[in-house]
Amino acid sequence: MNNKTFLEEFINYSNQIFPAIDSSVRNSIKEALRQFDINKFSWFSTVDLGGVCQGDILNKIPFTFQEEDGKSYAFPTKAMVISNSCDIENDKYILLAPLIPYLDTDEFDENQKRDLLNNKYNGKMCLSYSSVGNYYIDFSRIQSFNKNLIVNLINSNKIKLEYSLSQFGWYFLLTKMTIHFMRVEDHKLFSTRLKGA
């Protein structure tokens, strides 16, 4: 898949997930997305954004995952900053999502790996065809960390801020998070909620 095809897929994907939006608004969104220069398409910004921002990728964060039997284990990996940039300034804690390597694992078959690469899963995001394209961001494993600890580790070079998202990458992140966290529930469940009101 080349950049042009990927951009077209993203445009169609965005329109599918917001079906209730008026068609004229959808068309204007389509046109706005087409303004991205596909010859310069990049997930990452070449400009320093001046601090920790939403969508930044950090090189090594000690996540803790839990197994079915209740046992926990450490999983040091790259992380994406999920907290809104304004919240990062004001809050004591920062939300980070782990980047999970998936190419060298038997967790996914080849079709599932292709679907990950093409961003077909709601709760996962892949920065396809990039230097971190062999990872996916897992929105179901977001964890909270002390902001000052993270900032101090960056300032002391114990953690490296590897990448900041470009405008395109940031819009894509917002789209994926909107789908995962704010999509409408199935009709039956929604109707049941209404009965209990």
Describe the residue ranges of each PLM region.
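C-terminal terminal-subdomain/extension
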Residues: 1-51, 65-74, 107-197
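Compact nucleic-acid interaction/catalytic patches
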Residues: 72-120
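Short acidic, S/G/P-rich loop/turn micro-motifs used as interaction or catalytic elements
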Residues: 63-67, 86-89
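Pocket-edge structural micro-motifs
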Residues: 62, 98, 141
